[in-house]
């Protein structure tokens, strides 16, 4: 909105030179991040106070670590603040004629809405019973497929492609489109079934991985700051012709605007961390974790870095993998691999303090993200 008012109107139409700075992506990304940060810091106390007034408190599972019982009643659904602090700065600073920006924002809102419904039912029932696992998964798959269809429609207008970029293999770009079917006017969507399925796996996986990581004060949101920061770099270089050519990335000029969305995600996450740091004053709830996971996954799909996402969000992947291994091992062998899953609970039961686990997982997340960025030059 500010981009449209101050650059396209004030500068391009009336040649008001000071507003020329709004054409620069780095400037708008930085200010989107700052806007999101200060929105979180300023609005945060009012949100926490209102959540307390409405008695929207977190229900703690009895089978979880005993040390968590003291957190019962801590305000939850703070993810509403995160989502607002991402969307509003993006609307202010991004070029709203960009299709990818809208896809990312709407995906974030949609995944957040699923989480909001789940949180609301838990609070209303005064128990840890929200949406059924089947309903939750079904809604996530639906949103993911809608995101994929949106990208297919963009692709059919020549602004996107369904190829995979494989890390470390520069010349191998498999296409997830069945090209022979894509030319048929009435059944063309069938040609994109592999792409739809792949996007569904990425988005459902990323949203649930962040959700599983959100078990300790500041853990998930701190890892999100790092992952979103890495995505900010990737979106910028993917949209910059010279950087993209130098690093061997797909040149996609329009995805550069997503760096504003990612910058807003970084600022929003830091602002929320101010109140979510141990001991937490508020929890993000599913409304926050699903929105953030959906946003991260959507951006990765748009910029063709889906296969790099497991490194960008390495801690999220380890947390999700620990649950899969634990459940699989117990069903097949009646034995548990970890003392408790997700992984952070395992370390709690080993005697690590909550603060130590959080900081060490942040460090691991930073190492993963830096490794992901270094792979750009290893292709």
From Swiss-Prot:
The keyword Iron does not apply. Keywords: Cell cycle, Cell division, Cell inner membrane, Cell membrane, Cell shape, Cell wall biogenesis/degradation, Magnesium, Membrane, Metal-binding, Peptidoglycan synthesis, Transferase, Transmembrane, Transmembrane helix. It catalyses: UDP-N-acetyl-alpha-D-muramoyl-L-alanyl-gamma-D-glutamyl-meso-2,6-diaminopimeloyl-D-alanyl-D-alanine + di-trans,octa-cis-undecaprenyl phosphate = di-trans,octa-cis-undecaprenyl diphospho-N-acetyl-alpha-D-muramoyl-L-alanyl-D-glutamyl-meso-2,6-diaminopimeloyl-D-alanyl-D-alanine + UMP. Its main location: membrane. It is a multi-pass membrane protein. It is found in: Cell inner membrane. PROSITE patterns: MRAY_2 (PS01348). GO terms for cellular component: plasma membrane. The chain crosses the membrane at residues 27-47, 76-96, 100-120, 135-155, 185-205, 218-238, 255-275, 283-303, 307-327, 356-376. GO terms for molecular function: metal ion binding; phospho-N-acetylmuramoyl-pentapeptide-transferase activity; UDP-N-acetylmuramoyl-L-alanyl-D-glutamyl-meso-2,6-diaminopimelyl-D-alanyl-D-alanine:undecaprenyl-phosphate transferase activity. Its EC number is 2.7.8.13. GO terms for biological process: cell division; cell wall organization; peptidoglycan biosynthetic process; regulation of cell shape. It comes from the Bacteria. Pathway: Cell wall biogenesis; peptidoglycan biosynthesis. It is an enzyme of class 2 (transferase). CDD domains: GT_MraY. Its cofactor is Mg(2+). Belongs to the glycosyltransferase 4 family. MraY subfamily. NCBIfam families: mraY (TIGR00445). Catalyzes the initial step of the lipid cycle reactions in the biosynthesis of the cell wall peptidoglycan: transfers peptidoglycan precursor phospho-MurNAc-pentapeptide from UDP-MurNAc-pentapeptide onto the lipid carrier undecaprenyl phosphate, yielding undecaprenyl-pyrophosphoryl-MurNAc-pentapeptide, known as lipid I. This is Phospho-N-acetylmuramoyl-pentapeptide-transferase.
């Amino acid at each position: 909105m500010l981009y449209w008012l101050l650059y396209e109107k004030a500068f391009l139409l009336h040649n008001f030179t000071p507003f020329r700075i709004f054409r620069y992506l780095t400037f708008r990304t930085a200010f989107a991040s700052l806007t999101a940060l200060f929105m979180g810091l300023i609005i945060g106390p009012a949100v926490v106070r209102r959540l307390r007034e409405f008695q929207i408190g977190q229900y703690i599972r009895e089978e979880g670590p005993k040390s968590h019982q003291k957190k019962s009643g801590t305000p939850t659904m703070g993810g509403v603040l995160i989502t607002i602090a991402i969307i509003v700065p993006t609307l202010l600073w991004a070029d709203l004629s960009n299709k990818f920006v809208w896809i990312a924002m709407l995906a974030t809102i949609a995944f957040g809405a699923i989480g909001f419904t789940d949180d609301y039912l838990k609070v209303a029932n005064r128990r840890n019973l929200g949406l059924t696992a089947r309903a939750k998964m079904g809604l996530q798959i639906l949103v993911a497929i809608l995101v994929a269809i949106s990208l297919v429609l963009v692709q059919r207008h020549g602004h996107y492609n369904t190829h995979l970029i494989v890390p470390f293999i520069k010349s191998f770009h498999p296409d997830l489109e069945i090209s022979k079917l894509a030319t048929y006017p009435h059944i063309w969507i069938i040609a994109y079934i592999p792409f739809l399925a792949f996007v569904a796996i990425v988005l459902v996986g990323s949203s649930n991985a962040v959700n599983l990581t959100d078990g300790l004060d500041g853990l998930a949101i701190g890892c999100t700051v790092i992952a979103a920061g890495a995505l900010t770099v990737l979106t910028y270089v993917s949209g910059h012709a010279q950087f993209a050519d130098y690093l061997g990335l797909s040149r996609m000029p329009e995805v550069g605007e997503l760096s504003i969305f990612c910058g807003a995600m970084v600022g929003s996450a830091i602002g929320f961390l101010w109140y979510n740091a141990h001991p937490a004053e508020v929890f993000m709830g599913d409304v926050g974790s699903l929105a953030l996971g959906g946003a991260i996954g959507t951006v990765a799909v748009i910029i063709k870095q889906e296969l790099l996402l497991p490194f960008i969000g390495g801690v999220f992947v380890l947390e999700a993998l620990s649950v899969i291994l634990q459940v699989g091992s117990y069903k097949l062998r009646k034995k548990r691999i970890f003392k408790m899953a997700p992984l952070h609970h395992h370390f709690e039961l080993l005697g690590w303090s909550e603060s130590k686990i959080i900081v060490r997982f942040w460090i691991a997340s930073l190492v993963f993200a830096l490794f992901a960025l270094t792979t750009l030059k290893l292709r």
